[in-house]
């Protein structure tokens, strides 16, 4: 299951205007008093220009192919009004409880899609149309929020506590608890000349399936006969309320549906209730909209077309002005509040400056006796932060909002957000949950020992716990992509530090093995961050994250790739670039279908469709005695299930799958096409095209060198540690697969591995294979035989080691310790385990260890434990705290000169070089190497290898290498190496790999063509026969024609040159009549291929 959007209502708030009957549960429908439903104007899905300029580059072509699938009206991504659905499919329950709802998230991804389309094609009309559609249907119009003029910034809302379980609701409004003042309300009104709020509401029922008819601009609750989109809300009742426990309600309440007070008294307790409107914005979606428009303006300006997007840019700046409400505490209380009676905030005392979960606003429908309210949010999740948007809103003159204090607010927010990421970053890279200024949603005192961030308490799962909000890896992709964008756009050093730690963790946890590709799915967190100290961050040695499951969520994979690509483009890191490319290639080759891309999803959680309430547990809670009806007549009463108040699901074309499951059958499976995920894939393809693809990308087909020097380390009766000498690669080695006999027992990203669960007194043979980001795998190493120790009778642990020395640089710590002894007659000392905080960072037989890759000016705590052959482990040594040196210590020492320069592989057009790694003793750390061909620098690399391409056959070249460190010091040049490229050979050959994925009457074929000869192919034509009546319908990356059974694919302008060993991927969608055999043979330029 993709966890996608998880939105919360703004809980409970009401304007304090002397009337006690105002329910203000944020995020419900508009309060329009217009009569008559009216017919929504039919808005066709905005296609791109009917004629667009030719686009070069394989990945730009892929982007356009995916874009065209999304924008094809026949594929069902948009409604008749031109509104993007959450998904093509209707039977879908996640944050939206129906696939044909929409979210502010979907609109923000649409804006991203059109921004990228404008960059690729220079056509900006679709972007402007997307914003106009959002403004019309997702931002409440003036008539939808009619009583904002009554809003009083000095008394924003009436307090009502949140609770941890839905059964504690409704929540009593309490005017005796004072809130603070709203410092931006009057300013916004003065700036824009009215009191309207310019934010998207987060959720809408596009097809009016519920029948509330809360139609933007047309009416309040016009009922089931109203056509077009309808503002609705769901989440209202605390962190335990999952989507399965929600009661849908209109965002405008006229008491037509629900109970006697509509739906209000399910959520808030009051003496009486008034008709009203209420909306909730989701901060990440509005910020993403600003983010997309920032890039659109950059690209349009580069094209000389800034005027084409100027109006949309101005609207995005306005949205950013109002988005500031999410930077404030819910009831504008001071930051660090731990009691409902804590002091109310004045001015910026209530600003936490983080993008919190929402802001919300509402008011009366009666304009003759109006009232209105506004709230921020106390809860901040790292996955909602957007430092790129904050930076743009505070530094880009075109995007800086008009309000006088907006620029300063967003500048403070950018810095605070980056600190937030740093505070929450686990010692091994992942970003933990978030923080709250209102513990338990009621300003309670946090438990003793709760770490804090500027007074806000750490929460591992902010906002919701069913499932925990930071279990889903997608939050990592979403949150960190924006950090990577900021780093790419501005070079921000703090953003880079976050990424330098996050990227290797992510890269190591992605597999790109063809159809079995996978990315992390669920995470497990251990420990907590330390209380934040901006002057001396600790690096959180006591906080770690573990990937507990993997999956094929195409949207998460694509947004992860986008984060890696922005980082790679700025840093020059090839491992992240190549991993992202390989991931996108795997999805493109294995997951395409006629609607876009997809993977099979098994939905065991659909068992909750018919769950009923269990006291203090799961299920929809309806208070005793409460009854009401949905617009279609479904009864709402205690004991109802999710399905009972959504009976329309029983008519869904896919319902039989679910019913079979509920009756005891197999878990249902689906191929979903979520709008955000499809757009994320398109975005990643466009990013690669823009940042890396010049139309002549040469795939990496060279495997790393074979690992050598295998040797045994610590060996006990049940464990064996082995190590080896690092391999080299033409790009970068990304890991090693370790085999025990013929069985792969693990993967390592370093040059050592510990195999556990072994049998005593048994010989095991180990081999190791190296692999790179492109998936190339080396031959196995020479085998190493290790014999485990005999089962000992020793149950006594060795003596405790004592740390005797420590030293540090800016990026490393070295510790030494005294030798331990084992008991007389014992099994013997095996080695030592070294811990940084709670994380074991090394096993060694030596008495010293150097920990590298650390952060400057940061304190780290180390302990050492001794281990004997029997597996007994000593108590830890006394901890020693070591602080790394400051980056400000000037490093003026150059790295050592690279030695051992050699040519590994030489072809007619390329030379693969390797050399021995340099060392750096100046403290700043080795940065990389500059490679020179003659006097010209031809490339830089972070590893001790480099491949120079585009050379001329039979030509002599001379190479030297210089090492660089992070302080900018450069070594002297290595000894020169002369290399002559190979002489061209006559003749040529080819191979073709053909894979087809079939369904019903259609199929997608992926074709990989490889030049296996020794000469370059300039221009190619592939031929083959489809012998069972199959037809080619749509192809990509080539010009496709078919005559009878014969199919011909001719190269595109950008992939016609195939160097020896080079591969090109093409493909097509086709139809069949029941049989779909693969072609029996292939020709390339008339010659047969294998």
Curated annotation (Swiss-Prot):
UniProt KW Hydrolase keyword: yes
SMART domains in the record: CBD_II, FN3
Residue segments, region Catalytic: 54-699
Keyword Repeat listed: yes
Class of enzymatic activity (EC top level): hydrolase
CBM2 domain sequence ranges: 983-1090
This enzyme's EC code(s): 3.2.1.91
Positions with biased composition (Polar residues): 1070-1090
Fibronectin type-III domain residues: 706-791, 797-887, 897-984
One record GO biological process: cellulose catabolic process
Catalytic activity: Hydrolysis of (1->4)-beta-D-glucosidic linkages in cellulose and cellotetraose, releasing cellobiose from the non-reducing ends of the chains
Alphabetical UniProt keywords: Carbohydrate metabolism, Cellulose degradation, Disulfide bond, Glycosidase, Hydrolase, Polysaccharide degradation, Repeat, Signal
Disulphide connectivity of cysteines: 990-1089
Molecular functions (GO terms): cellulase activity; cellulose 1,4-beta-cellobiosidase activity; polysaccharide binding
UniProt-listed CDD domains: FN3
Positions of region (Disordered): 1069-1090
Catalytic site positions: 513
UniProt xrefs under InterPro entries: 6-hairpin_glycosidase_sf, 6hp_glycosidase-like_sf, CBD2, CBM2/CBM3_carb-bd_dom_sf, CBM2_carb-bd_dom_sf, CBM2_CS, Endo-1-4-beta-glucanase_dom2, Endoglucanase_F_dom3
Signal peptide: 1-33
Propeptide feature: residues: 34-53
Similarity comment: Belongs to the glycosyl hydrolase 48 (cellulase L) family.
Function: Hydrolyzes cellohexaose to a mixture of cellotetraose, cellotriose and cellobiose, with only a trace of glucose. It hydrolyzed cellopentaose to cellotriose and cellobiose, and cellotetraose to cellobiose, but it did not hydrolyze cellotriose. Also has weak endoglucanase activity. Hydrolyzes glucosidic bonds with inversion of anomeric configuration.
Protein name: Exoglucanase B
UniProt organism field: Cellulomonas fimi (strain ATCC 484 / DSM 20113 / JCM 1341 / CCUG 24087 / LMG 16345 / NBRC 15513 / NCIMB 8980 / NCTC 7547 / NRS-133)
The organism's taxonomic lineage, starting at the top: Bacteria, Bacillati, Actinomycetota, Actinomycetes, Micrococcales
Gene that encodes the chain: cbhB
